[in-house]
Amino acid sequence: TSKAPQKQDASNPKKGLKNFLISAQEKEEWTRLMLAIQKSADAVENLLDDGISPNLRGRESFQGYTPLIFASEIGSLETVKLLIERGARINDSDSEGRTALFHASENGHSKIISLLVKNGANPNAVSVQNRTPLMQATVNQHLEGMEILLKNGANVDHQNHFGLTALMLGAQNGDLDSVKKLLLHGAEINTASKNGFTALFMAVQNGHGKLVSLFARFGGEVNQKEKETLRTPLIVAAMEGHTPVVELLLSLKADPSEYDGSGMIPLQGALRSKQFETAELLIKGGSPVNHQDHRGQNVLHDATVAGNLGLVKMILEKNADSSSKNQRGETPLMLAASEGHLEIAQLLLRSGASRLIKDRFGRTAWMHAIDGGNVELVKLLAKGGYPASEKLIFAASRGHTEAVEIMLNLNADPDSRDERQWNALMWAAKNGHTATVQLLLKTGLDINSMGSKNWTPLMLAAGGG
């Protein structure tokens, strides 16, 4: 039996050569046309008369440009007119989905924008990133181009892939004139992006006070929360340290007690970002001082950690609780001790802060001072509170030789024992604190004394216990 005839291979050499020659010809024609567009409309006309297509596609670095797109981008008005007359497709786009109108709008070529829309260019054609010509004109502050687009049907509230509108993009840039134009053309003021940011948020984040004021006059919501962190404009402004914007928002009735998803209020945001001028304004503006976030941290805790004595004083004068605890059981005094803030610790003690409170891990403020390594704070907190012998054992276990010496000078019994019947020497030996061991031996402690399980300091130093 005879076999059926084989189909010719689609990738045969003759066809491949033909495709290559066509491709090479188009590339050569595009190069000639591109050079002509940069030269003059007459030069372009000569090539079109020679049969080169007005809808030829650019290759490689020209990302699928058409002659009309390229002429619109560089602002060659006469060439744009010619190409339209010779049949150029007005709404063709490049490989990024950008039309001739998109490129003209991006570069502020107003006369070309006007010509294109009169000849049917779609003002709402979107790029692959879902951006419109109006967005590009706004970003680049091309007011005349914006006006033409808006009068010819551009959607003022179109949102890109991130949910941003032209109004938001103008707000990001702080461009008052562009924003005014968009608002006068009916831009929706409280539209939110995918993460919940409005145009007012954008203005606040970048410290554009005049825009914030303008948005408020047009009905911008000053207490609206964004979606991810649930922060308000006031929290964002406080964290960024935009004090004039914070003052403005307060005058517009922004709520200083509104908190974000972590329970943080604007004042805490300012303190944690060390925006002290802003924090002072918020305190004077009536911010609550005893509010706790979801970790139990309050304003006094935050001001203490930030190390600002003046703000701690202001907060205490507002009747903040000097012995308040966070979820870890830490008081402001403990945090001052940990962070090495001596003057703040002194102020807290004068305001009635207790030395006796222990955190969830059984540590007092003095123990926090030991771990923080600040000798002056160790001295300050050494007197009062728990027995000196208990403090001596803790200091020895941490190897804080100066603290051990301080407690010995306060008549702590060097041979006092804890619940395991271990003394300070045993703890220092177990943890390898040689200098502390040497100091304690000078007190006459017996190196062969035993604790629980009959462990001696020497055994503990060798790895026992």
Identify the function of each model-found stretch.
Residues 26, 58-61, 94, 127, ...:
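Ankyrin repeat boundary/linker residues
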Residues 35-40, 70-76, 103-109, 136-142, ...:
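Ankyrin repeat A-helix N-terminal signature
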Residues 29, 61-64, 97, 130, ...:
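Start-of-repeat signature of ankyrin repeats
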Residues 40-48, 76-84, 109-117, 142-150, ...:
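Ankyrin repeat structural motif
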Residues 194-197, 205-206, 228-231, 235-240, ...:
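Core solenoid repeat modules with strong leucine/isoleucine-rich periodicity
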